[in-house]
Amino acid sequence: MSIRYESVEKLSEMIKNNEIKPSEVVKDIYDAIEETDPTIKSFLALDKDNAIKKAKELDELQAKGQMEGKLFGIPMGIKDNIITKDVETTCASKMLEGFVPIYESTVMNKLHDENAILIGKLNMDEFAMGGSTETSYFKQTVNPFDHTAVPGGSSGGSAAAVAAGLVPFSLGSDTGGSIRQPAAYCGVVGMKPTYGRVSRFGLVAFASSLDQIGPITRNVKDNAIVLETISGVDRNDSTSAPVEDVDFTSEIGKDIKGLKVALPKEYLGEGINEDVKEAVKNAVETLKSLGAEVDEVSLPNTKYGIPSYYVIASSEASANLARFDGIRYGYHSKEAQSLEELYKMSRSEGFGAEVKRRIFLGTFALSSGYYDAYYKKSQKVRTLIKNDFDKVFENYDVVVGPTAPTTAFNLGDEIDDPLTMYANDLLTTPVNLAGLPGISVPCGQSNGRPIGLQFIGKPFDEKTLYRVAYQYETQFNLHDAYEKL
């Protein structure tokens, strides 16, 4: 019996009841990867020897009845910008090819403490810059629902691997939609937690005021279980919030009668595909049938989210990526004849086109003559966007809308057109700019490609998002679709 499509919750139950050994789970997962991943191309590196070794150690603990840890024996895949000790971490870039970290990220320490098993590292857009996984230096991941379509990005490998049944859960990072958009495109569940909910220690920085790590799963409850495991304050990350640990599963199963839901008119306006609009309208009717009260509201500064985001994110990236200089670690140009040439050539040869574009954009926005006109102005717009959400949340519990304006686009269609590519972030970037939590769940399909529904919550109110997402999932999900892929 293949367990590749079983949930985290079900696998945990099977292991605790001695119905299956961790080593059998791991073998089944690697068999699935061997069979499917040559087509999907979601993994960049496999940690097979260590995974098999750990699984056998857990077998022995299982035999003794010592099955400690929320994720005991559960396999996982990790986006390749999250540091994994002794396992190559490249950020899908030539710049970090062959880089093997000597320390562990906080989220990995937490997952190891709960006895999860690392299967491997997952493909992504280079340094998390992109929305299709097409900027990866190493390979092009495809969408499990349609191999001619992108899986989204930048956490495309993380979403594709979960949808294809290659891991029951993965971790991604979300700077402007990089968990939620690929989750929408691949028909899975992706949570971008509140900024500060999850430690960023060991996440290779793109934009430090926007980045956040979160889980991708095939159902809502699994997602809550994983977020519970990785969240919490961390002394190694000064931006992690000193909030109490939360039982995220405690709200799951509670009804949503009387829950006040806001539907921004801007989220169904210009640029939103008709099939996506229809699916979201149907989802809203479903929420009403479950007892929620849904009203139309306005988030007037939504349209400024993309320009504000790309100035701020690129500015922070230009500073963060200055550390990749060809000297301390990473790609080192062999042709350089001087120190200046070494810097220039290592960075020119080591970074891909999209990363260089954003470094240029960010450096320009921070330059003395343009700082006020671009970076400072973008931060003011960011405040306006946050104020819009604050005003809505005075009267509503949750905001709902599409995750992305369209379904997954075809491979190659937008990679040479950055403005069209950036437009896919219309509905996700405002959430990062405001530091809010957002979750994407499947709500339909168009020509076989999944459509994502996004719920946005108040700061640190992921519990309510899980509550409403779970209730919606009972009425619509793609659980039967995964095994047919």
UniProtKB/Swiss-Prot annotation:
Cited Gene3D superfamilies: Amidase signature (AS) domain
Cellular component aspect of the GO annotation: glutamyl-tRNA(Gln) amidotransferase complex
Entries under PANTHER family matching the protein: GLUTAMYL-TRNA(GLN) AMIDOTRANSFERASE SUBUNIT A, TRANSAMIDASE
Protein name: Glutamyl-tRNA(Gln) amidotransferase subunit A
Species annotation: Staphylococcus haemolyticus (strain JCSC1435)
Residues at the catalytic site: 79 (charge relay system), 154 (charge relay system), 178 (acyl-ester intermediate)
Keyword check for Glycoprotein: no
Reaction(s) this enzyme catalyzes, per UniProt: L-glutamyl-tRNA(Gln) + L-glutamine + ATP + H2O = L-glutaminyl-tRNA(Gln) + L-glutamate + ADP + phosphate + H(+)
Function comment: Allows the formation of correctly charged Gln-tRNA(Gln) through the transamidation of misacylated Glu-tRNA(Gln) in organisms which lack glutaminyl-tRNA synthetase. The reaction takes place in the presence of glutamine and ATP through an activated gamma-phospho-Glu-tRNA(Gln).
GO molecular function terms noted in the UniProt entry: ATP binding; glutaminyl-tRNA synthase (glutamine-hydrolyzing) activity
Lineage: Bacteria, Bacillati, Bacillota, Bacilli, Bacillales
